[in-house]
């Protein structure tokens, strides 16, 4: 199973016609055995305190899956290994350090137990939880892979003894993007009339989730290229969910159909939406209130060497998307994929350095758009981050700098494996 240490592979093939403009379910692996960055092997411990490693998954959705890889107990490096709860993720903890006796069954979260998958291997356990498309949860759940009671001594050549202690691996899953009363649920029925032109027309809005429920096995010719960065779930229990992107780059009028495999007949579906207007952002080519984005200013007209254009998105804001137009020198060159983020040091000498926005927000659930002809960049944040963050991109021309400062508000003011997805698909399609 060294494939778990392999790099990220994003593969999805369930429905014919899925193309690169679709975002597929994300996979998150908390690998406490094979990943050298977070393994729980005994290491040098001079403080006596337990060293904690782990991963936080913030609001997974639409068939995203989380996998825990935990070493099995043995007489060497994992002598006192303990997985808590022992049946994770079929049961879970609401506090990170409670005991097995405090575990809660998955059904208490109103997630069916079949969404939890377990597989034993010779030297490790694999536990997977699949996040359903519809849920009403406001909880943070935990599972532990605890090797902290394993202690060893390493004798060096000079006779010195070095104390080694295992680490505590912690999985934290935040589930608070719930839908109290799920909307946009459409029951799709078949039409048996030959040549039928009846259509199910669905009006779309930015960021909303559309749920298609149908009876029986189906296949589709889905091919809506106009909708870029739409996230789509694994079709489970005759339910297919689609999250619309944070922006529509053009008017949408897309038709596709579901073909009912067993009983015959088709269902025609039409998606419609208006192009997103008035995206908040900074246009550094024209005066404020004009141009592609309304909050910028013309660099040639500013009095100082630099000025800041601030944009707010996220919780409590009107939008989860922001734009930037800069046909000049842009830093980082691939804004927003890369951003300037203030690195804080204990001595107070803070400095802005280049980071991946994925790393700053601790999520891969981010939408990126770029129009080379217009020198226009757009970023969309469909999932509210765990923490509020501020990032920058700098547009420079003739000695003048326009600084776009993007403030992303939170709700609280990664290895992806084809093997894991294959396991999920094979198990769920047995039902």
UniProtKB/Swiss-Prot annotation:
It is found in: Cell surface; Cell membrane. It is a lipid-anchor; GPI-anchor. It comes from the Eukaryota. A lipid is attached at residue 409 (GPI-anchor amidated serine). Gene3D superfamilies: 2.60.40.2860. InterPro entries: 6_CYS_dom, 6_CYS_dom_sf. One of its GO terms (cellular component) is cell surface. Disruption phenotype: Strong reduction of female fertility, while males remain unaffected. Gametes are unable to either recognize or attach to each other. Residues 1-20 form the signal peptide. The keyword Aminoacyl-tRNA synthetase does not apply. Its main location: other. Glycans are attached at residues 45, 239. Residues 410-431 form a propeptide. Pfam families: s48_45. Keywords: Cell membrane, Disulfide bond, Glycoprotein, GPI-anchor, Lipoprotein, Malaria, Membrane, Repeat, Signal. Residues 26-178, 278-413 form the 6-Cys domain. Disulfide bonds join 30-55, 70-145, 88-143, 282-309, 326-395, 335-393. Required for female fertility. This is Female gametocyte surface protein P47. It comes from Plasmodium berghei (strain Anka).
